[in-house]
Amino acid sequence: MPWIQLKLNTTGANAEDLSDALMEAGAVSITFQDTHDTPVFEPLPGETRLWGDTDVIGLFDAETDMKEVVAILENHPLLGAGFAHKIEQLEDKDWEREWMDNFHPMRFGERLWICPSWRDVPDENAVNVMLDPGLAFGTGTHPTTSLCLQWLDSLDLTGKTVIDFGCGSGILAIAALKLGAAKAIGIDIDPQAIQASRDNAERNGVSDRLELYLPKDQPEEMKADVVVANILAGPLRELAPLISVLPVSGGLLGLSGILASQAESVCEAYADSFALDPVVEKEEWCRITGRKN
């Protein structure tokens, strides 16, 4: 069925309030878009992280009286009479199919593919992880996830134990298991991420080798041959004393979720415990790796 969209431009601080206003005016869904394509951090679990200049887009049924919607919105204290907006009639198309068509199998490194369930596997002999977009972060589309997957693909994980610190969808832990790791441990502060990781592990036939914990439940003195943490630069710096003790002596560390401009400060937080490799960058993001002293 056809739809009508109404777009407002605002600050990140006001975006949530205007989202609520659009829903109260009859919008069936809301989308936030960056007005200037400015790179931002990935959201923490449960958080909506917005840009300084944000477009808030409400989607309305084609039968909606948009003059009435505008009249309702004019009463909002952040808008007022004659507020700037854009109304557009969208063509009739299968939007669910349109969304699904945007996701394709993706290759990382030499062996690893991430494939949505509705697509054919490009190479039956490759290491294939079946993963659909969902509630928790991590489908391989973000540069930080890509950097971590490429790093894991480059390692010999046969028989190793891997910790995925901030596991999100479980994509890194599951990829490690499919690449030969004997055991993976996923840790996340978000119960939804734990459930998403569990579901994705079952789909990929590795649930018997994946342990999942909220931080308060994780075992004491937990160790691994490889530790990967794709979170944010701030938490990586703050949690450096905790993360640094997770790899065994000679074990490997991979960190991402870091803008290239933040790499130096993150490296400083880990330099005493690890022999660090050169920083690898991709699309203004970077990956830091090293070996435990």
Curated annotation (Swiss-Prot):
The keyword Membrane does not apply. Its EC number is 2.1.1.-. One of its GO terms (cellular component) is cytosol. It comes from the Bacteria. Its main location: cytoplasm. PANTHER family: ELECTRON TRANSFER FLAVOPROTEIN BETA SUBUNIT LYSINE METHYLTRANSFERASE. This is Ribosomal protein L11 methyltransferase. It comes from Escherichia fergusonii (strain ATCC 35469 / DSM 13698 / CCUG 18766 / IAM 14443 / JCM 21226 / LMG 7866 / NBRC 102419 / NCTC 12128 / CDC 0568-73).
